[in-house]
From Swiss-Prot:
Record PTM Cysteine methyl ester, positions in chain: C465
Enzymatic reactions: an aldehyde + NAD(+) + H2O = a carboxylate + NADH + 2 H(+); a long-chain fatty aldehyde + NAD(+) + H2O = a long-chain fatty acid + NADH + 2 H(+); a medium-chain fatty aldehyde + NAD(+) + H2O = a medium-chain fatty acid + NADH + 2 H(+); octanal + NAD(+) + H2O = octanoate + NADH + 2 H(+)
Active site annotation, chain numbering: E210, C244
Residues reported in the UniProt entry to bind NAD(+): G188, N189, A190, Y191, V192, G193
Protein name in the entry: Aldehyde dehydrogenase family 3 member B1
Pathway recorded for this protein: Alcohol metabolism; ethanol degradation; acetate from ethanol: step 2/2
Gene: Aldh3b1
N-acetylmethionine modification, residue list: M1
Function: Oxidizes medium and long chain saturated and unsaturated fatty aldehydes generated in the plasma membrane into non-toxic fatty acids. May have a protective role against the cytotoxicity induced by lipid peroxidation. Short-chain fatty aldehydes are not good substrates. Can use both NADP(+) and NAD(+) as electron acceptor in vitro, however in vivo preference will depend on their tissue levels. Low activity towards acetaldehyde and 3,4-dihydroxyphenylacetaldehyde. Able to metabolize aromatic aldehydes such as benzaldehyde to their acid form.
GO biological-process terms attached to the record: aldehyde catabolic process; aldehyde metabolic process; cellular response to oxidative stress; ethanol catabolic process; lipid metabolic process; response to oxidative stress
Entry PTM: Dually lipidated in the C-terminus; prenylation occurs prior to, and is a prerequisite for palmitoylation. It is also required for activity towards long-chain substrates.
GO molecular-function terms, A-Z: aldehyde dehydrogenase (NAD+) activity; aldehyde dehydrogenase [NAD(P)+] activity; benzaldehyde dehydrogenase (NAD+) activity; benzaldehyde dehydrogenase (NADP+) activity; long-chain fatty aldehyde dehydrogenase (NAD+) activity; medium-chain fatty aldehyde dehydrogenase (NAD+) activity
Cellular component aspect of the GO annotation: cytoplasm; cytosol; plasma membrane
Length: 468
C-alpha cells in the first residue's frame, strides 16, 4: 500500500483550489517560518549540537541567521517578485500587453541532506513558498535530532493542507520519487543525484540538483602564509569539514607548502587549542559510516598535522596531508571531513591544468596579492562559484546565485534566484480582438511586399512608440 498517495493528493487539490496563490497567504507562511526560527532557536541549536556537535556560533552563522535572512528578504520583496515583468515589444505588438508572469509550478518535493539540516531545508523552502507552491519536505534521517524538530514542530507554523514533512530512509525516498511532482529540489551527493534525476526523467519533472565535488584552492607564492592559513583553516574545518563548498585540496609550490604547513598548525592551535578534541568549537563526524570512510583516508600521503581519531566520539582531528599523489583515494573522492591535502605544483599554469582535468567543482578558490593571478584563475577555469582571497564568503550574499555546474549540480537558488527557480516563467501576450486590418499582412495570398513590411514590424523595438 502506498503511504504517500492520500497526502500528495490532498496537496494537489489544495494547489488546484488556488490556496497558495495570493500574496497574503505566501506572506503568512513566510511569517510562520520566521516564528519557527525565533521560537525554537535554542531547541534547534541543541539538535544541531546533538547531531553534529555543532557549536552555537556555527549554528547561528550557518543555519539559523542565514535562514532568517532569506525569510526577511522574501517578505520585503514578495510583491515585487510576484509582479508581471513587462518586456520589450516589436512594431506589430506595440498596442498589446507583453509580459512574463511568475506562476508556481504546483507540488514541489525538497530532499534535504544532513550536514546543514536547517539551512538546506528552510532556504529552498522559502523560495518554494514565496513562489506559491505546495511543498513536500523530506529531511535527512541521518541528522535524527534535527529531523525530529522538522517533522514535529515546523508543521505547526505552516498551513498543513499545503505543506507536509515525510520521514524515512532510502526505501521511503525511493517510493516518494515514484510519484509525479511538478518540481524536485535535491541537495546531496552525485550518486544519489543521478537516482533522483532518473526518477524525475520518468515524469519529465524539472529539477535542481545541488551536489558537490572536489573544490580546489590555489595559493600563490606571494601570499602571507598566516593570513591564508587562518582563512583556509576556518572554512576547511568549519562543521568538521562537512561542507559542500569547503576546499578539498590546496595547490601550491613546494616553497609555499613549507611556509604554509607551520602557519596552518598555528591557526589550528589558535582556533581549537593544543588538544582539538576538547574544543567546544570543533564538530564531529555525523555517523560511524562516514567516520570509518574518513579514517581510511588518513593513510594517504603523509600526515603533517593532526591525524588523530576517536571512534567513540566520531572525532577526527583537523588534519593536513602532504606528499599526496593524485591517484590516492583522498584525491579521487570528495573528502567531506576535516582533512586537507596539499598538492605541490611548479606554476600557475600547472595548477590550472590540474584543476581543469577534473570535473567542474561546486566552488573554486584562489589566493594571491596580484589581482591578475586571481583573474587568470577565474578566466581559465569553471565552477559553480568562485572566491578570491577567502573561503565561502560568497555564500553569504543572497545577491549571488548558488549552484553547481556539470557533476557538481544544476540550477541556482538563494534570494530572488530561489523564487525564480520555483516559478514557471510564463510568456504572455494579450492582443486586441479588433484592428484586424493590420493582420492582413500575414495572411495568404502572400506577397513580397507584405513580407518586407511584416519583417520590419516583427523587429523588436525598445521604444514605447505606439504609432503603426
Amino acid at each position: 500500500m502506498d503511504s504517500f498517495e492520500d497526502k500528495l493528493q490532498q496537496l494537489r487539490e489544495a494547489f488546484k483550489e488556488g490556496r497558495t496563490r495570493s500574496a497574503e497567504f505566501r506572506a503568512a507562511q513566510l511569517q510562520g517560518l520566521s516564528h519557527f526560527l525565533r521560537d525554537n532557536k535554542q531547541q534547534l541549536q541543541e539538535a544541531l549540537a546533538q547531531d553534529l556537535h555543532k557549536s552555537a556560533f556555527e549554528a547561528e552563522v550557518s543555519e539559523i541567521a542565514i535562514s532568517q535572512a532569506e525569510v526577511d528578504l522574501a517578505l520585503r520583496n514578495l510583491r515585487s517578485w510576484m509582479k508581471d515583468e513587462k518586456v520589450s515589444k516589436n512594431l506589430a505588438t506595440q498596442l498589446d500587453s507583453a509580459f512574463i508572469r511568475k506562476e508556481p509550478f504546483g507540488l514541489v518535493l525538497i530532499i534535504v541532506p544532513w550536514n546543514y539540516p536547517i539551512n538546506l531545508t528552510l532556504v529552498p523552502l522559502v523560495g518554494a513558498i514565496a513562489a506559491g507552491n505546495c511543498v513536500v519536505l523530506k529531511p535527512s534521517e541521518i541528522s535524527k535530532a534535527t529531523e525530529k524538530i522538522l517533522a514535529e514542530v515546523l508543521p505547526r507554523y505552516l498551513d498543513q493542507s499545503c505543506f507536509t514533512v515525510v520521514l524515512g530512509g532510502r526505501q521511503e525516498t525511493g517510493q516518494l520519487l515514484e510519484h509525479k511532482f511538478d518540481y524536485i529540489f535535491f541537495t546531496g551527493n552525485a550518486y544519489v543525484g543521478k537516482i533522483v534525476m532518473a526518477a524525475a526523467a520518468k515524469h519529465l519533472t524539472p529539477i535542481t540538483l545541488e551536489l558537490g565535488g572536489k573544490n580546489p584552492c590555489y595559493v600563490d607564492d606571494n601570499c602571507d602564509p598566516q593570513i591564508v592559513a587562518n582563512r583556509v583553516a576556518w572554512f576547511r574545518y568549519f562543521n568538521a569539514g562537512q561542507t559542500c563548498v569547503a576546499p578539498d585540496y590546496i595547490l601550491c609550490s613546494q616553497e609555499m607548502q613549507e611556509r604554509l604547513v607551520p602557519a596552518l598548525q598555528n591557526a589550528i592551535t589558535r582556533f581549537y587549542g593544543d588538544n582539538p578534541q576538547t574544543s567546544p568549537n570543533l564538530g564531529r563526524i555525523i555517523n560511524q559510516k562516514h567516520f570509518k570512510r574518513l579514517q581510511g583516508l588518513l593513510g594517504c600521503g603523509r600526515v603533517a598535522i593532526g591525524g588523530q581519531s576517536d571512534e567513540g566520539e566520531r572525532y577526527i582531528a583537523p588534519t593536513v596531508l602532504v606528499d599526496v599523489q593524485e591517484t590516492e583515494p583522498v584525491m579521487q573522492e570528495e573528502i567531506f571531513g576535516p582533512i586537507l591535502p596539499l598538492v605541490t605544483v611548479r606554476s600557475l599554469d600547472e595548477a590550472i591544468e590540474f584543476m581543469n582535468r577534473r570535473e567542474k567543482p561546486l566552488a573554486l578558490y584562489a589566493f594571491s596579492k596580484r589581482s591578475q593571478v586571481i583573474k587568470q584563475v577565474l578566466a581559465r577555469t569553471s565552477s559553480g562559484g568562485f572566491c578570491g582571497n577567502d573561503g565561502f564568503m560568497h555564500m553569504t550574499l543572497s545577491s549571488l546565485p548558488f549552484g553547481g555546474v556539470g557533476t557538481s549540480g544544476m540550477g541556482r537558488y538563494h534570494g530572488k534566484f530561489s523564487f525564480d527557480t520555483f516559478s514557471n516563467q510564463r510568456a504572455c501576450l494579450l492582443r486586441s480582438p479588433g484592428m484586424e486590418k493590420i493582420n492582413d499582412l500575414r495572411y495568404p495570398p502572400y506577397s513580397s511586399r507584405n513580407l518586407r513590411v511584416l519583417l520590419v514590424a516583427m523587429e523588436e523595438r525598445c521604444c514605447s512608440c505606439t504609432l503603426l
